[in-house]
């Protein structure tokens, strides 16, 4: 488990261009590198998708948008907890683990805080490269009432690489270069009595791009990976990349209801996202159009967790409860005049109509769980539990875009796809001393596949009984050790996970879909040191994993793609805190080389990836009790490199071959009123 508090997050963001996804990639063992764009596609945890929670509300969707980490204002985050490995207690896609984000809390002494930030590349001083933000927070209590309010604005400029060239937009999954972002959130809590607490929270975040730049399509004529993506000016597109996220969350807590601790939650989420336009005229599944997809989702859910002490069994407790989620998704697309598009060299988009790529899809999940925890003595403890989950996906009959223009179009018959499963978990921990513990665990995870990506690419003869719609069930085995000695703390974990059917893989924009039998084996280790005076500290981590898959109707295994299994990752840092008011951190991250090709042939997610190292320097100084200045230098050695996502080229050509940011400075000033 990795925990980051508010102070650590604020510090690390200044060395990562403000990106939460990049902060986590540098700080969390087992997590792949970030894309440096709007998407967290390919940023797997232990080779599988992670469940992202914001105040307990899932950001994952059945029709996966891979935009969970960019759908919340980073300034509103108070702490992050990452649990690695599949989890039988949570449903909804926790196959690789859980990234749990908590926003700033209500209550306490009345406080107001203003934060102003400024960011610019140091390789090219231009007004369009300048980013800035301002945020305001209010928290406090009034009698039995707690409150919190935060709001802010951010202007996101354009990044520049180590040579001073503008980094091109990412056309496959999108980006938020040249964007405006607004966020507002609030919490109102009421102490009913000493044991009961009721809170309502609302959060709204809107980030929308407004750029004049596109990724030059002329780079496609060169062999993939041989030239960087190039930004060209002249884009004429009214509606660009966008994330709009609304969360409404009602929670109730009771510390002692007939001896039980109760945590209940009801939430509603409304999410809209828009992608970059795409020339899909060679793709029959999308109707052979120049198009732009957007997606609308709303989710209603609830969760109840009850903790019951079983004192008659000694130091024992029972955690039990259930959860419910109902999601509705639809995916329209706009179509553009192909002649105008061609005449402009792929820069001008004139809308001429719209179509439905994926009609309204309803998915529902109902789960119940029970977990028994028991401590035998000071050295031995164990827990075991089970979860039952019942899910379905439902859609009405529809004619897919693959049938557009055909004389006798095929209609996909509507209906329900049902799935249910019993999941189990067990954990045994031995602590020979207070400083050391050894554990072994078994956990199962469960999720529906990406039903939307299957249905929207349906062709002749497709039926809802397809094996592509069977659920993903993951078995995760882990053996680990945690310890501390003198001024050192360390951890070591070895894990192995298997699934008979992995997630649905889409190749060539849905022209080819595949599911494989998967197994992932890996190792994670950390080592940290802090001197007696709490002045000097150092540490690092190592992550290594290997993924193998066996395609359906094949007896041969092959390596999994780089979008699933990252190369060797090493992290290291040195901290120097000479006073209580001055903090300094130098950090470095290394990703190794890995050849993901099969028989030396490039294909989706399969390229010969080169190693890269990046380093950041961050310093934070408290001028007084109320004022703090933080300065971060990202990529301090101004290394020219391609992140993993860019080397794997999501678009399968050079338009996604984006260089990383060059030397960039981010400064922030905060004042408490």
Predicted regions and their residues:
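Transmembrane beta-barrel wall of Gram-negative outer-membrane proteins
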Residues: 126-157, 161, 165-212, 244-255, ...
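C-terminal beta-signal and adjacent terminal beta-strands/loops
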Residues: 446, 495, 590-599, 620-673
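Gram-negative outer-membrane beta-barrel transporters
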Residues: 115, 378, 391, 487-505, ...
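Extracytoplasmic beta-strand/coil segments of soluble accessory domains associated
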Residues: 21-58, 78
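A beta-strand signature from Gram-negative outer-membrane beta-barrel systems
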Residues: 72-113, 672
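Membrane-embedded beta-barrel scaffold of Gram-negative outer-membrane proteins
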Residues: 251-253, 261-279, 429-431, 437-443, ...
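Short acidic/polar hinge/loop motifs at secondary-structure boundaries
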Residues: 57-84, 136
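Flexible loop and strand-edge segments within Gram-negative outer membrane beta-barrel domains
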Residues: 158, 175-181, 195-249, 271-281, ...
